[in-house]
Amino acid sequence: MSGPVSVGPLISTAEILPARKPPWLKVKAPGSPNYLRLKRLVQDQRLHTICEEAHCPNIGECWEQLTATFLILGDICTRNCGFCAVTHGKPTELDLAEPDRVAQAIQRLGLEHAVITSVNRDDQADGGSAIFAAVIRRIRELSPGCGVEVLIPDFRGNEAALRTVVEAAPDILNHNMETVPRLYREVRPGSRYEQSLELFAKARRMAATLVTKSGIIVGFGEEREELLQTMLDLRRVDCDILTLGQYLRPSQQHLPIIRYYTPEEFRELKAIGEGMGFKHVEAGPLVRSSYHARGQIEEVNQKRRVEGRK
């Protein structure tokens, strides 16, 4: 890319990308008592969180509310996505005790909703799906009232791996599309747009009432029509929940930010998504996959009851 340009504005013509972040992207530095408590627990249990590994801007707010997204299957990813701060390389051996440590941490925190995600483990035949299932089941054993959301990789299209996770019965199955198909080679090398879409169709066939969720990051240079088409594609495979957030560049080695979307544009995207039929749309500059995750399942289930769909 030659440099920042105005790309596909939703409401008005975009300005050339400013040198500084706009004011709506500023966040308070973390340091609350709950934040420090959770940080100590994660360290004591030898766990990883995507909040830390991916430099999430909401870490202070979420950890203050004792909400965290636990990262399983290690902290080294076999893929090297252009936007992601997680370390890429040769991963370590799987830790079979990890499900118990994660579940114990969730129990100690008294969480009502737990989010579990992972690095890609293309070195494993099942992509790590058995560990995902073990984590879900162990959380159910130790914290029966805790909702469980999993943010899974594409498992390279392995249907048996997906079934392993679905049959463990998470409350929400999340898989992020991240971007529009034209930008997949840059943003998600090693992944395929249609394969990720098909994951949702397969999951729906496996479990008709499973709540599904996906996320899109904006600011890579996508056009308006491409973004709206990706949202429509997700509705076509009956995705229930959509998150939309601004791309923030982790380092100079990552993809550049082409445009900052305004809060007003995110509000418009939320309204458009709701009009398309998503049961919940979380949209905002700092929104990430697990942002306000706890309340989303209640809203989806309430709308399903109104529709007569359990």
Feature-to-residue mapping (PLM):
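Core AdoMet radical
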Residues: A85-R101, R108-A160, V165-A201, K213, ...
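Auxiliary Fe-S-binding modules of radical SAM enzymes
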Residues: M1-T69, D100, Q104-Q107, A134-C146, ...
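Glycine/Thr-rich phosphate-binding loops of Rossmann-like dinucleotide-binding domains
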Residues: N80, Q124, L183, Q252, ...
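A secondary-structure boundary/capping signal
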Residues: E52, I72-L73, T117, L151, ...
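Short connector loops/turns at beta-strand edges and beta->alpha or beta->beta junctions
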Residues: D75-T78, L111, E178-V180, Y247-R249
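Local cysteine-cluster metal-coordination motifs and their immediate loop/turn environment
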Residues: I50-C62, L73-H88
